[in-house]
């Protein structure tokens, strides 16, 4: 699925040796299946692992990937390019921008959950956060809840209005309103 060169694997092993024990690697795609798709690699602590993640085994480390983006990672490669100037990781995912997965979700709730998992949560996961759809009320209000680094973050108002709400209302015209039902408590888990 993801071919990681020996040089890149050794680079990851070196980086992970400087992180807290149990820290692994996460591969993600922001806006998968669109022309704006962007691939990325980040650290993944044990607390960041989700039930829907797939664990890939490599020499001395694991890579976690959200199950919903697997089709976009077909034939992907991560390599470490070393030259006179320095070194740089390269990540090639030829299917990242293709609308490769079929939308099989039947209900509005399933379609919004898929949308959040594929388009919003990859961005929020870079800050250790996530947004969940709790339910859709009878008056077509989407009730959502933020978890992880988003809970108690001082930027949550901007994230809610400028990213989550704007995108849900734009992609799902049947939704009239988005309400955040998170009990925001600022703490060490909060990103800002």
Curated annotation (Swiss-Prot):
What does the UniProt keyword field contain? 4Fe-4S, Iron, Iron-sulfur, Metal-binding
Q: Name one Pfam family in it.
A: NifU
Q: How does it assemble?
A: Homodimer.
The residues that hold [4Fe-4S] cluster are 150, 153
This protein's cofactor list reads: [4Fe-4S] cluster
* Cofactor descriptive note: Binds 1 [4Fe-4S] cluster per subunit. The cluster is presumably bound at the interface of two monomers.
What cystine pairs are annotated?
none
- Functional note: Involved in iron-sulfur cluster biogenesis. Binds a 4Fe-4S cluster, can transfer this cluster to apoproteins, and thereby intervenes in the maturation of Fe/S proteins. Could also act as a scaffold/chaperone for damaged Fe/S proteins.
> What is this protein called in UniProt?
Fe/S biogenesis protein NfuA
Q: Which domain of life is it from?
A: Bacteria
Which gene produces this protein?
nfuA
């Amino acid at each position: 699925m993801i071919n990681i060169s020996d040089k890149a694997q050794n680079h990851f092993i070196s980086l992970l040796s400087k992180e807290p024990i149990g820290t692994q690697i996460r591969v993600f795609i922001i806006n998968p299946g669109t022309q704006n798709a962007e691939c990325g690699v980040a650290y993944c602590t044990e607390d960041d692992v989700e039930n829907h993640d797939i664990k890939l085994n490599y020499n001395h480390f694991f890579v976690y990937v959200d199950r919903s983006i697997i089709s976009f990672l077909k034939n992907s490669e991560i390599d470490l390019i070393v030259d006179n100037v320095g070194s740089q990781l390269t990540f090639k995912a030829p299917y990242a921008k293709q609308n490769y997965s079929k939308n099989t979700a039947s209900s509005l709730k399933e379609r919004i959950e898929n949308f959040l998992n594929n388009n919003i949560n990859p961005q929020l996961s870079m800050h250790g956060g996530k947004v969940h759809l709790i339910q859709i009320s009878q008056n077509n209000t989407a009730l959502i809840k933020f978890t992880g680094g988003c809970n108690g973050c001082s930027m949550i108002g901007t994230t809610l209005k400028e990213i989550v709400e704007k995108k849900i209302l734009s992609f799902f015209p049947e939704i009239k309103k988005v309400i955040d039902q998170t009990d925001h408590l600022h703490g060490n888990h909060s990103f800002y």
